[in-house]
């Protein structure tokens, strides 16, 4: 297995499932309803919905960086505001997250091994560190989502 294949495996485990640590991001989101996703059960903490939009934005930014774009997020892009909390809009948010994840995996799969040690873009961390950061980011926010689900109470 190449290093790129190992990175892809870790990205999939953290996001899709079969992760060593417990439920992956998609597994945690599978039973979340729109009203729960929009709720703020813990004061001064982002909602599940806001976290999903945030993760989607960063997956897209990392994909763009792999493609040579300097992709910087504004505060609004980093933490988008949820304006409509319908079940359709919640599904759109989850679909966007999945699409951005799949597009990032496609970009990673096209990488040559030698690129892993080069800066993702000039003046930034290496491609390898960036991609490990994607996995870490998914796991960090998966933990937040798990805690928010517990704070919401029984489903």
Task: Enumerate the language-model features and the residues they cover.
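Short, contiguous alpha-helical
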Residues: 2-22, 26-29, 34-80, 119-155
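Acidic/histidine-rich alpha-helical segments that form the ligand environment
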Residues: 82-118, 129-134
